[in-house]
Every structure is written in structure tokens, then in C-alpha cells.
A protein has these predicted regions:
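Short helical segment in ABC ATPase nucleotide-binding domains corresponding to the A-loop/adjacent helical element
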Residues: 101-109, 119, 123, 228
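Conserved ABC ATPase "signature" region
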Residues: 116-134, 187
Length: 261
């Protein structure tokens, strides 16, 4: 079972929207609440605004309407952040001239964290995602796709974020490696209990990882369903072979089909 909540971070959206220049509406009238320490997946078709939602939560975009609260900050149409946020993108986005450890250290450098503690924090983050001291000295081109994604995850975790945002991080990986990283992510979440928001278009992955699943319509994105996933943690790959798992996947898939109709 997960540990009890260790932080008060949460995310609350009230009628949030995003309209880009030219009038394209990416997200329309979205409302939801995510409590501290929850693991919530957001599923929907490509182009439905899932990534836009994450970027607004991260403060990389400003909503064009509604109220979005992230942590303790509240402002109409503006994202205010309280506490640390980690972001894992679909592409690892590693700096090619830096080693794995140097890439992981970048958020600490930008935060001007004390130099005397950086090395130990980087080593801890790399170890947490299953990378060795030898891996830490390699540049991205010397690492496999799965290892680069582990470095990206370690970089997001090194600041010990209260909120962890993941934008389809495993979408480009093969099924076996994807399952391995799903299990690694679950282990890390159970150990640290950040508020995790995981974007994916893979329903099976969402059911396997999340406590709740928010179903999003095709663009402009609206949330039509908030599905509670009943399975206890820790979850194991064998769960995917059960009838209960298949029924849960079927329920979410049916919601997606109805949302698209």
C-alpha cells in the first residue's frame, strides 16, 4: 500500500480554457481536483489538449480562461506555483554535451542549490531510477533510449518535487521496456508519493499505473469522465492478464469512444 500523504500539494482547475493565437481552442471549460500524493492519468486522443493541460500546470503556459490552482497559489487565468514541480517530457531532451549526471544536476544548478550537496543528490536520483555510476559518466549518445528516459526521470526527481508531471514519457519505447519503466515509476511514486499527473493515450498503461483516470474529448479538450481505478498497490504485470483488468480497460475505452462520438 502507498505511504500516507507527505505533502499538501494539489492541483485544482475550475473552468480552465486555452485558446491560442488565431482562435484555435485547445482546452475548453476543464474542471478537476487532484489531491496531494495522488496518481492521476489523463487519457485522450492525440491533439486533444492533454499536453497543453500539463504545460499550464507547470507554468509554461498561461490559461486564457478559468482559475487554476497549483499548490497554494491561486489566480484567475494565471498559474502560480507553490513547491517544486518536476516535468518528464515524451522526448528526454537531454543536453548532448553533458554527461548523464551533469544533465540530472541541471535543475540544481538553476536553483542555485549548494554545490556541496549536488553530487550526493544527483547520485541518489540516478540510483533511484536504476542507473549505475558508470552510466552517470556517459553522454546521451552512449545511452539506449530507455536509459535516456531514466536520466530524464532522474532529472525531474532530483529536486524532490511535490508535483511530478509526465507527458507520455514511455510512448516511443517497445512494450517490454515500457512495462519495466511503468514498474519503476510505480516503485518511485510509492516511495516518494509526489502528486503525479501522467498523460498517455494508452488506456492499459493508465489503468495499470493510476488511481484515477480523467477522460478527455477530442479537441477542444473537455473532461467527460473521472474513473476510479480499484486495484491495490503494488501492482504487478500479472494484473494485466486478469478479467478485472480487462473490464477496467474496457470501461475507460468505452468512455473514450463515447467522448469522440
Amino acid at each position: 500500500m502507498p505511504q500516507e500523504n507527505r505533502n499538501a500539494a494539489d492541483v485544482v482547475a475550475n473552468h480552465v480554457g486555452m485558446t491560442f493565437a488565431g482562435g484555435h481552442v485547445a482546452v475548453a471549460d476543464v474542471s478537476f481536483a487532484i489531491g496531494g500524493g495522488e496518481f492521476v492519468a489523463i487519457v485522450g486522443p492525440s491533439g486533444c489538449g492533454k499536453s497543453t493541460l500539463l504545460r499550464m500546470i507547470a507554468g509554461l503556459m498561461v490559461p486564457s480562461g478559468g482559475v487554476l490552482r497549483v499548490g497554494k497559489g491561486v489566480a484567475a487565468g494565471v498559474t502560480r506555483r507553490s513547491g517544486r514541480i518536476g516535468f518528464v517530457f515524451q522526448d528526454p531532451r537531454l543536453l548532448p554535451w553533458r554527461t548523464a549526471s551533469q544533465n540530472v544536476a541541471l535543475p540544481l544548478e538553476l536553483d542555485r542549490s549548494p554545490k556541496m550537496t549536488r553530487s550526493s543528490r544527483v547520485a541518489q536520483a540516478l540510483s533511484l531510477v536504476g542507473l549505475t555510476e558508470a552510466d552517470a559518466t556517459k553522454t546521451p549518445r552512449m545511452l539506449s533510449g530507455g536509459m535516456r528516459m531514466r536520466v530524464s526521470l532522474a532529472r525531474a526527481l532530483v529536486t524532490e518535487p511535490e508535483i511530478l508531471l509526465l507527458d507520455e514519457p514511455f510512448g516511443a519505447l517497445d512494450d517490454l521496456l515500457r512495462q519495466q519503466l511503468n514498474d519503476e515509476l510505480e516503485r518511485i511514486w510509492l516511495a516518494r508519493r509526489p502528486t503525479a499527473i501522467f498523460v498517455t493515450h494508452n488506456v492499459s498503461e493508465a489503468v495499470y499505473l493510476a488511481q484515477r483516470i480523467l477522460v478527455v474529448t477530442p479537441s477542444p479538450g473537455r473532461i467527460t469522465n473521472d474513473v476510479v481505478v480499484p486495484f491495490e498497490y503494488p501492482r504487478r504485470p500479472e494484473l494485466k492478464g486478469t478479467g478485472d483488468f480487462a473490464r477496467q480497460v474496457g470501461e475507460v475505452s468505452a468512455h473514450l469512444r463515447r467522448a469522440a462520438s
